[in-house]
């Protein structure tokens, strides 16, 4: 069983260097090709493409200028990302055996890196998958990545007893997984809040819950998708009446 999560816009590189392994991102050729494009972008280009402030545009231009796909340095991706999903995952509190297990079962989808493993060396960047960045391969990053991400996930799941891909990513990022090229059955987890008799998806809670599900899988070394139905962290419960074979709904009373 393999799970995928989205990256985060915010990063935290203040974490002390650890004794954890640092692995090389798998899609080096594509990363190098894409970094040649991003290096040419001006701050004005980035502001327009990503709808960000002048300050963030300047910061990210500096990041792209400094980015070197040949340098095998950085911080482990699962440690460096710092958003709601990663607050739920709380990887900095996982011990080494748990993180080593996650290295084989967790993948992070990325606009710049394509697919990251937890220990992969991450350099500071920001490039959302939905960015309409033109390359030789097309008008946006979905065109650029094509079938590459799906093929990489297929390879990652080889040898797993249960080949199911557990989708804990956002629609923006999972949209980069080419359905025709993917050879794995997919289960997408949805997290909803109940209030006044109605169920709603609330962004902050849903993002954190995706991270909590990833943590639940890692803590319990779950390698069969059916066992996810036992997820009960933070008050969530599986809702069989609202679920299908491909879309599993978990709900709780809204805090």
Curated annotation (Swiss-Prot):
A biological process (GO) of this protein is:
response to hydroperoxide
A cellular component annotation (GO) from this entry: cytosol
Q: Which InterPro entries match?
A: YaaA (IPR005583)
Q: This protein's superkingdom?
A: Bacteria
Q: A Pfam family for this UniProt protein? A: H2O2_YaaD
PANTHER family associated with the record: PEROXIDE STRESS RESISTANCE PROTEIN YAAA (PTHR30283:SF4), PEROXIDE STRESS RESPONSE PROTEIN YAAA (PTHR30283)
Q: Which family does it belong to?
A: Belongs to the UPF0246 family.
What protein does this entry describe?
UPF0246 protein CCNA_03496
> What organism does this protein naturally occur in?
Caulobacter vibrioides (strain NA1000 / CB15N) (Caulobacter crescentus)
